Amino acid sequence: MRVLGIETSCDETGIAIYDDEKGLLANQLYSQVKLHADYGGVVPELASRDHVRKTVPLIQAALKESGLTAKDIDAVAYTAGPGLVGALLVGATVGRSLAFAWDVPAIPVHHMEGHLLAPMLEDNPPEFPFVALLVSGGHTQLISVTGIGQYELLGESIDDAAGEAFDKTAKLLGLDYPGGPLLSKMAAQGTAGRFVFPRPMTDRPGLDFSFSGLKTFAANTIRDNGTDDQTRADIARAFEDAVVDTLMIKCKRALEQTGFKRLVMAGGVSANRTLRAKLAEMMKKRRGEVFYARPEFCTDNGAMIAYAGMVRFKAGATADLGVSVRPRWPLAELPAA
């Protein structure tokens, strides 16, 4: 069984083909980073228009990469939310139209379920149950996962997501968009301990997060200490350490609360090397395991949508002829498979 996956929720156009026996057959990705760089962030209208230009050519490229034709595709999966409404509509319209033209089922996929399941694409996939840390530019959530669609929200950010805080702080440090990876690179040159940032909401019970205050703390630290290269690197180091420590503390609490021995982290920020190292160290001490996707599958991509679509298709999920998307879509609303 082969599923074509289409991802257009934000500023990456991702197309992939997944075979339930052979694995990933094709993976095509186009990033709009250069398009939005001059604006310091994603411009929704420009994102939608670029998806219109790139989606069909990338589908053609994926078919060519896999050596398949339309007749070989058994279903079409597309991201139906959450995300930018215009961008979502492009992928949903193309996906639904292809499914109709090819006479195959169309499968709407939840973007964050795609991220959550991305580690399943690796050679050593996690088994249920596990705690999932979904950490990206738009989400920071801790989820109890006992099966496909069996998701319980344990905690989430009450303001900025961790990835958003990375990007905003990077901008304060004069880094280009998207600044998160650049901030991490700068932090590697920083001196640990010169500046100490707070670990938000770790001094009270609960599993919720708050990262907006770290941005303000960074702004004040930059204002009071200047912007020479070493100072900027030291501030970046202090900021990254604060975010990573906060995530680690909350993950530890979630594992203690659930009693689970496995931790899965997914989303763009899960590619952060410092975060990976700290969580791996923590899980080793707890005699547990941590799982994550390869870096290219941490950010938005079509492979995770094709895989999630395969899982949902086998569980009987299909869509009618209508094209509908959900810019806001709580993960807990998904049905169990």
From Swiss-Prot:
Annotated positions binding Fe cation: H111, H115, D300
Keyword presence, Mitochondrion: no
Subcellular location as annotated: Cytoplasm
Location (main, coarse): cytoplasm
Binding, substrate: L134, V135, S136, G137, G138, D167, G180, N272
Molecular-function annotations in GO: iron ion binding; N(6)-L-threonylcarbamoyladenine synthase activity
Keywords, ordered alphabetically: Acyltransferase, Cytoplasm, Iron, Metal-binding, Transferase, tRNA processing
Bound cofactor: record note: Binds 1 Fe(2+) ion per subunit.
Record field: catalytic activity: L-threonylcarbamoyladenylate + adenosine(37) in tRNA = N(6)-L-threonylcarbamoyladenosine(37) in tRNA + AMP + H(+)
UniProt GO BP: tRNA threonylcarbamoyladenosine modification
EC number, as in UniProt: 2.3.1.234
Cofactor(s) annotated in UniProt: Fe(2+)
PROSITE patterns: GLYCOPROTEASE (PS01016)
Record GO cellular component, one term: cytoplasm
HAMAP family named among the record's database cross-references: TsaD
Cross-referenced NCBIfam families: gcp_kae1, T6A_TsaD_YgjD
Similarity field: Belongs to the KAE1 / TsaD family.
UniProt function note: Required for the formation of a threonylcarbamoyl group on adenosine at position 37 (t(6)A37) in tRNAs that read codons beginning with adenine. Is involved in the transfer of the threonylcarbamoyl moiety of threonylcarbamoyl-AMP (TC-AMP) to the N6 group of A37, together with TsaE and TsaB. TsaD likely plays a direct catalytic role in this reaction.
UniProt name for this protein: tRNA N6-adenosine threonylcarbamoyltransferase
Gene name tied to this protein: tsaD
